[in-house]
Amino acid sequence: QTFTWMIEGEVVHRDSLGNEQVIRPGQVNLMTAGRGIAHTEDSVVDGARLHAAQLWIALPEHERRREPAFQNHPDLPVVDVGGFHATVLAGSALGHVSPATVYTPLVGIDLTAAGAARAELPLQADFEYAALVLRGTATVGGAALAPGEWLYFAPGGEQLAVRCDAAAQLLLLGGLPLGEDILIWWNFVARTQAEMQAALDDWNAGRLAPVRAGSPAAALQAPTLQGTRLRG
């Protein structure tokens, strides 16, 4: 699954199912690739500033060949906690449930503060977590983080202290460890080297469904493995 959280600017999504959707700030686009989907993402206004967080969510083995799908979520649950404006992007948190469809136990929260803020967030003990600062600076679990910096937390925690001294925005992501090895190359996810090679061959030969909604972008060629041995 490709999960896009739009922060600034507008992007139009088009895909091989025929969807065409503009995503705006405060909205989520969720594309489930399943057995296969092609898509493009283009700026609505050329040269405009864009800022988004795009995350990939691995489907478990028993779900990964499901039918492809696309969702746009313009309305997400929001709660104020300790001066943070908390948006529940995925899963269940802070007494709210996101409408986004996911296939493993996980959670995603955007924490945005206009000024100084401090919160103690409850954690699920069997989840692993990561924090990512998007704008400003924040202290998470006692560690100071700058924009673009990640901090990982192993399972076992029950609470997490988050604070900022000025305006900031960060993501808190968590979930049960997947427990499966996956391979990633370019825009493809597979379980074996042979499966990855077959997907690359099909794409570069034009055997996969094209984007149907009139995207101006031409299909890109996937880089070949060229003797590379992938490891999960």
Predicted stretch roles:
Residues 1-232:
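Jelly-roll (double-stranded beta-helix
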